[in-house]
């Protein structure tokens, strides 16, 4: 089949087509010229990542920041107000002083202070609405299942400014993502074209925010056995303190793919979001935008997108069985979860295994987790061989060896990272 035929056979984007708010070339230049004369609002790192995702079509069918009715429906019903599935609010906040100056129909320039370009985008104001402390707490309880300020996602929401601004956006910058992560950072159009060139139709996405260790490799290879290919898709936006930067993680993946994967069955990519640490809800978001990237399946393992002990080890799998069904395929989530049980290194099996394949006991097993990898390396300890491939472990050891002491944080092991909760 031709590349175009292969493209046509890929899973449809959420909403039926890719909605892209990013401008290019002369049109972008004209928009920037206009934006420089507009009032300006500073946006956060998270908001900038969301703006870029809307720009490249990753958040299709969204074309702007959410109105209050959409925000409320997403929190309570997992859908936009029109019934289209969406699991996490995509909002932009402003101060009370800024809110008083904004009017419906007004256009405002958006700027992220670390953007390498002068203007990040614009928004045409549709609605300005207050977010009281009670509103924010409701969002946190619905999305993160907690209002505990120690939860990094909760902390971000509670620190947001007191008003949200809704409206259609125009994205005028992708920041440094295409330059810093050249060849890795990928738009949905680019991933779809890559899949079509490879002749793939069924694709499993592997979400990564930690260095790729043996459990990740095991998950990816399970997926390759049942799908045409696996898309190793790394977050290249901001993480919490103590997490390993994307450029280091990308090197680890490169080393693994180069020596331990059949190259025609794997593709590495990156996406521009900040991590929300939303556990089950974020797992749904990961599946939603992977549909836009062209993936039919989303690998969901233990404690997907989790942090601390806020979620059960497989809550992120269970939530897929609870989301609303819509008869209209354009309005429902089409990408399916690939649910995988506890994975670990078993000394008696002499390799990676899962509860479905290993008959041995807890004492024979070693849980391989990103948290454990970061904790041991940050404490100057040497990781056992079964935690990762030698090539990637060397990259990680070199990173920690040269890490400024002021950037080191104490890493606590949650119970799922130790395997205590495993049967």
From Swiss-Prot:
Pathway: Sulfur metabolism; hydrogen sulfide biosynthesis; sulfite from sulfate: step 1/3. This is Sulfate adenylyltransferase. Its main location: other. Belongs to the sulfate adenylyltransferase family. InterPro entries: ATP-Sase_PUA-like_dom (IPR025980), PUA-like_sf (IPR015947), Rossmann-like_a/b/a_fold (IPR014729), SO4_adenylyltransferase_pro (IPR020792), Sulfurylase_cat_dom (IPR024951), Sulphate_adenylyltransferase (IPR002650). Keywords: Amino-acid biosynthesis, ATP-binding, Cysteine biosynthesis, Methionine biosynthesis, Mitosome, Nucleotide-binding, Nucleotidyltransferase, Transferase. It is an enzyme of class 2 (transferase). Its EC number is 2.7.7.4. GO terms for biological process: cysteine biosynthetic process; hydrogen sulfide biosynthetic process; methionine biosynthetic process; sulfate assimilation. GO terms for cellular component: mitosome. GO terms for molecular function: ATP binding; sulfate adenylyltransferase (ATP) activity. Sulfate binds at residues 207, 209, 305. The active site is at residues 209-210. ATP binds at residues 207-210, 301-304. Catalyzes the first intracellular reaction of sulfate assimilation, forming adenosine-5'-phosphosulfate (APS) from inorganic sulfate and ATP. It is found in: Mitosome. It catalyses: sulfate + ATP + H(+) = adenosine 5'-phosphosulfate + diphosphate. It holds the Pfam family PUA_2. The record marks 213, 216 as: Transition state stabilizer. It comes from the Eukaryota.
């Amino acid at each position: 089949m031709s590349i175009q035929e292969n493209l046509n056979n890929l899973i449809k984007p959420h909403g039926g087509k890719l909605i892209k708010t990013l401008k290019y070339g002369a049109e972008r230049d004209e928009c920037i010229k206009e934006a420089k004369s507009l009032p300006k609002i500073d946006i956060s790192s998270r908001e900038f990542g969301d703006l870029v995702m809307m720009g490249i079509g990753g958040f299709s069918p969204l074309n702007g920041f959410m109105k209050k009715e959409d925000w409320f429906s997403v929190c309570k019903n997992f859908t936009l107000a029109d019934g289209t599935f969406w699991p996490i609010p995509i909002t932009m906040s402003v101060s009370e002083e800024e809110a008083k100056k904004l009017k419906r129909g007004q256009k405002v320039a958006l700027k992220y202070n670390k953007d390498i370009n002068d203007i990040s985008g614009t928004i045409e104001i549709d609605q300005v609405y207050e977010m009281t402390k009670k509103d924010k707490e409701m969002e946190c309880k619905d999305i993160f299942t907690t209002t505990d300020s120690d939860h990094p996602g909760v902390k971000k929401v509670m620190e947001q400014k007191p008003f949200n601004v809704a409206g259609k956006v125009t994205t005028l910058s992708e920041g440094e993502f295409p330059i810093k992560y050249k060849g890795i950072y990928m738009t949905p159009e680019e991933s779809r074209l890559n899949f079509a060139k490879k002749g793939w139709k069924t694709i499993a996405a592997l979400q990564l925010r930690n260095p790729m260790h043996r459990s990740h490799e095991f998950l990816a290879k399970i997926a390759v056995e049942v799908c045409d290919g696996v898309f190793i898709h790394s977050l290249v936006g901001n993480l919490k303190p103590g997490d390993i930067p994307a450029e280091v993680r990308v090197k680890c993946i490169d080393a693994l793919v180069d020596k331990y994967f059949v190259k025609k069955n794997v593709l590495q990519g990156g996406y521009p979001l900040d991590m929300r640490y939303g556990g089950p809800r974020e797992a749904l978001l990961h599946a939603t935008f992977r549909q836009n990237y062209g993936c039919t399946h989303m690998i969901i393992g233990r404690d997907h997108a989790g942090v601390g002990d806020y979620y059960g080890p497989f809550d992120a799998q269970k939530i897929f069985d609870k989301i609303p069904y819509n008869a209209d395929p354009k309005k429902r989530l089409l990408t399916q979860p690939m649910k995988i049980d506890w994975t670990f290194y078993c000394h008696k099996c002499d390799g990676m295994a899962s509860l479905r394949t290993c008959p041995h006991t807890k004492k024979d097993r070693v849980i391989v987790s990103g948290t454990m990898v970061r904790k041991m390396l940050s404490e100057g300890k040497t990781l056992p061989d079964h935690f990762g491939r030698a090539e990637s472990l060397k990259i990680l050891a070199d990173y920690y060896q040269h890490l400024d002491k002021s950037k080191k944080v104490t890493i606590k092991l949650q119970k799922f990272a130790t395997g205590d909760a495993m049967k």
